Regions:
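Secretory targeting and sorting signals
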Residues: 1-28
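Subset-of-secretome marker
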Residues: 3, 23-274
Length: 274
């Protein structure tokens, strides 16, 4: 995969027009060659380093009720930092705001995610909790990780293999939902994506639109569309994210109904932090 090919051709032409020693020309050529995007991403995924993200995402659910076409929209904006483990995202410190045309904007909240645990707070949530506690801890179900997904090297390779370069450093592609998720049971659907790279072939921007359809007439929706627009910056930044002090945390399971209701009203996400 060669990105920025036109720029490299121009560089080579300029070098060849000047008389330089063969060894020097060879060194210049090696230095100019861009790193493969997948290798560039892999090189960043090391403990102690991270990346800053700004993400806008949305879900549009179309369904029919009493022979009337209905639609639900939920939008989420996420800003913060991901910390890497060995080959993946191991922790996150993010500010999240959710909104919908039906309910308006919910109070924003902060979430720290580490492994299967997520810790959520904001001023209203802290006020609703027992004295001395300011964070609610929840645990991801099954073997899921509470940390938000980042594009993995394998996913990046798949997308590049199924994309075409439409401009310098910009790729566009499509795939079936089953192929994109490497899961034949994923159901009917399609995925459209755009990838943007900087001069070092590091991702700066991804846009992914996924459309899914019900498997049969018994499903409660007609169509579901997921849109995710993620911008990356500060690759390789030194990052250290730690869970809140245990003395400040209370498990969601230990909240009584009244306290949980107050926390949700203050912005605690009852369906999960992401």
């Amino acid at each position: 995969m060669k990105l920025f090919f036109a720029g490299l051709v121009a560089t080579a032409a300029a070098v060849s027009a000047v008389a330089v020693p063969a060894q020097a020309a060879s060194v210049a050529s090696v230095q100019a060659a861009p790193v493969d995007p997948v290798k560039a991403l892999k090189a960043q995924l090391v403990p102690g380093r991270g990346v800053k993200i700004t993400e806008s995402s949305g879900i549009i659910l179309d369904f029919t009720a009493d022979d009337r076409a209905m639609q639900i929209r939920v939008n989420t904006r996420t800003v913060g930092t991901l910390a890497f483990g060995k080959g993946n995202a191991a922790a996150a410190d993010l500010r999240v705001r959710m909104s919908s045309p039906q309910k308006g904007s919910n109070p924003p909240y902060r979430v720290i995610a580490e492994g299967r645990n997520a810790y959520v707070t904001n001023a209203g949530i802290a006020k609703a909790l027992p004295s001395g506690r300011s964070w609610i801890q929840s645990k991801a179900s099954g073997h899921r990780n509470a940390v938000p997904d980042i594009v993995t090297p394998a996913e990046l390779k798949f997308m590049l293999d199924n994309a075409s370069e439409v401009a310098t450093g910009e790729y566009q592609g499509t795939a079936t939902l089953a192929d994109f998720q490497h899961d034949r049971s994923a159901g009917e659907g399609s995925v459209e994506f755009r990838l943007y790279f900087d001069e070092h072939n590091l991702l700066t921007h991804t846009v992914v639109d996924t459309t899914t359809y019900p498997d049969d007439d018994t499903m409660a929706y007609d169509q579901m569309v997921f849109h995710t627009d993620t911008k990356y910056s500060g690759w390789g930044t030194k990052v250290k994210i730690a869970a809140p002090a245990a003395s400040k945390v209370i498990s969601e399971k230990k909240l009584n109904a009244k306290t949980l209701k107050a926390a949700i009203k203050a912005g605690y996400p009852e369906s999960g932090p992401f």
